[in-house]
Amino acid sequence: MERQQQLLAAYQQIHSLSSQMIALAQTERWEDLVELELAYVTAVESTAAFTGQAGPSMALQELLRNKLQQILDNETELKRLLQQRMDQLKELIGQSTRQNVVNSTYGQFNDRALLLGEPQIR
């Protein structure tokens, strides 16, 4: 019975970590998210090893199934938030690339680099 309680606690820890990761992503605390991800991966790996040994009862299996569904829902939400961030970064990289093209093309005609959208002084 103690092993089954430990297994449930392990799943609850994973769920808690995934919820914290979502909160960090929503507040754009990306560095903290990356740090927490290491703890999350470690918890998942140790729980996976422990799950094979425990042999949970039917009642516990149902609890674990519900907890696992919550974890998977969190994974989906986190993936969506990370995709949003990746799209933002792609846009910033695209702007930077366009800025570099403008500067290299037109910068040779002026003593200073041009910024996109900046009025030109003649």
Swiss-Prot record:
Residues 60-98 are annotated as: FliD binding. Keywords: Bacterial flagellum biogenesis, Chaperone, Cytoplasm, Repressor, Transcription, Transcription regulation. InterPro entries: FliT. GO terms for cellular component: cytosol. Its main location: cytoplasm. One of its GO terms (biological process) is bacterial-type flagellum organization. Transmembrane segments: none annotated. It is found in: Cytoplasm, Cytosol. Residues 1-50 are annotated as: Required for homodimerization. NCBIfam families: PRK10548.1 (NF007836). Homodimer. Interacts with FliD and FlhC. Dual-function protein that regulates the transcription of class 2 flagellar operons and that also acts as an export chaperone for the filament-capping protein FliD. As a transcriptional regulator, acts as an anti-FlhDC factor; it directly binds FlhC, thus inhibiting the binding of the FlhC/FlhD complex to class 2 promoters, resulting in decreased expression of class 2 flagellar operons. As a chaperone, effects FliD transition to the membrane by preventing its premature polymerization, and by directing it to the export apparatus. Belongs to the FliT family. This is Flagellar protein FliT. The gene is fliT.
